Amino acid sequence: MINESVVLVFVEEEAEKNSIYNTIEKIGQVCNFEEQKPFQITKRLKIICNNYKVNVEENVLQYLIECCGTNMQDLINETRKLIEFAGENGKIQKQDIDKLCIKKIESVIFDLTDNLGQKKVKEAMDVLYNLITAKEPVQKILITLYNHFKKLYFVKIAVANNKDVATSLNLKANQMFLVNKYKLQAKGFKTSELRKIIQELQDLDYKYKIGLIDLNVGLEAILCAYCS
């Protein structure tokens, strides 16, 4: 026996309006669930905080999203942690996020690169050592650094040629807040410097794979050489 109503869920990057789509739309109802944009996520997190009588500024919630990503379940878990720490009638501060929340490696790499752009070698090395101490695989750190510097290079090229940065980086609708962060950070590097760092990270990966160098030593050498 067929139920009177059936819910079909299709998970796709984009809704392709083919014959199946058109048929379903004709005889039923189509509802498209887009990924939430940062302002929508901020609004939901604010409601959660209000329910527990905890105050938080919008810019602090935006910082939480920058640090922890846009996955709603991750953000709810981190928000609950912050709510417990602040307590009823308390207030969540930016420094609470730095102390308590589990940051995405991409966010930490942003911090590391900020320090590199300002030639702060000690601070950059501290971020690297903290990642290693947190048991983050060094190979993953290398790959994330490489991808990050590639994005900064793409930003430089896009800005120089009056191209759209979001399109050049293939950012999703809920990642648009990253555009200004990338543009601001890219200003701290020359295009030639970014090319050189990217090449050095590629060379390090190759030398590591053939057993010529330790990854930790190689990363430290690249970071220190840039800041010198």
Which residues fall in each region the model found?
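The conserved phosphate-sensing helix
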Residues: C68-R80, V121-A124, V138-Q139, L194
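Non-catalytic interfacial helical region
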Residues: M1-D114, K187, Q202-L215, A221-S228
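C-terminal alpha-helical interaction modules of replication/initiation AAA+ assemblies
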Residues: V108-D111, E123-S228
